Amino acid sequence: VVTDDNPRTEDPATIRAAVIKGAREANPDGDIREADSRAKAIDEVVAWAQPGDAVIVVGKGHEVGQLIGDTMHHFDDREEMARALDEVLRQSADGASARYGDNDKKSHTLPQEQNEPKEHA
């Protein structure tokens, strides 16, 4: 997912377009996506990830601000990643509650056939 870093006074869409163009030239069959904010990009990639995937957020590192124009806005990739992961986990827990009829979200009991141990040959 291509997004903004510190666009300063440059047009962020122009920067993203140049990065996307280069990425498509390097990998024409790649699934290259664009998000107009880092928070949206992190949300999208975390929601898109499947079990076993690695999500790597690059660009800002330890920085806790994003310079847009002449204004420094608070932004911390680590905080945003934690928030996005919490949201996905909350949605997953809500989905499990709905599937198994458990609304207290404290424990989830699988249907009996899924609880029974399987015999191994």
Regions picked out by a protein language model, each given a short descriptive name:
Residues 1-121:
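ATP-dependent carboxylate-amine ligase
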